[in-house]
UniProtKB/Swiss-Prot annotation:
PANTHER family: NADH DEHYDROGENASE, NADH DEHYDROGENASE [UBIQUINONE] IRON-SULFUR PROTEIN 7, MITOCHONDRIAL
Function: NDH-1 shuttles electrons from NADH, via FMN and iron-sulfur (Fe-S) centers, to quinones in the respiratory chain. The immediate electron acceptor for the enzyme in this species is believed to be a menaquinone. Couples the redox reaction to proton translocation (for every two electrons transferred, four hydrogen ions are translocated across the cytoplasmic membrane), and thus conserves the redox energy in a proton gradient.
Protein name: NADH-quinone oxidoreductase subunit B
Cofactors: [4Fe-4S] cluster
Keyword Iron-sulfur appears in the UniProt entry: yes
Subcellular location, record wording: Cell inner membrane
Amino acid sequence: MEVKKPTIKSIPYEDFKDNEYLENMVKQLNEGGTKVLVGCLDDLINWGRSNSLWPLTFATSCCGIEFMAVGAARYDFARFGFEVARASPRQADMIMVAGTITHKMAPVLKRLYDQMADPKYVIAVGGCAISGGPFKKSYHVLNGVDKILPVDVYIPGCPPRPEALLYGMIQLQRKVKLEKFFGGVNRKENEPQNPEQA
């Protein structure tokens, strides 16, 4: 039995010969090397990282209850790549700060963030974590977690609905997919300069 191989029609070299753009591109690739392999690896690694984010929760109020609802069977955030919430910061990729953060809790939250491996992400959930909420004018409340941590995604609400939490988590996935893993994930520049100021 004879197997028929399809012929692949290629573009003749003569069509490329007089194209200045292609000649300049080939010259540039020959001089400086190519980043095609690194780009493909970036895409593959970011796909894996974005679809296997493990959250660490720092919940102090009603927003934490909504986060529990997202993890339950009705919403099931595991189907979007957010597996079981981790209890240790060393196993987590992102921290979800939900609820009022007091000045006394701020150093503990900062220590948890510092113990996470890079690259790490922060989601501020609810009005209390974003801006202090109804306790904003109180002397002991931190007016937003972004005073001590670099926040990647803000999810407003008091408390936000489970659908809003899922949407915010999916937005974080999109952000992770767009990052450059090789030479691009440097989060130190995004951190607040003086955490004691808060």
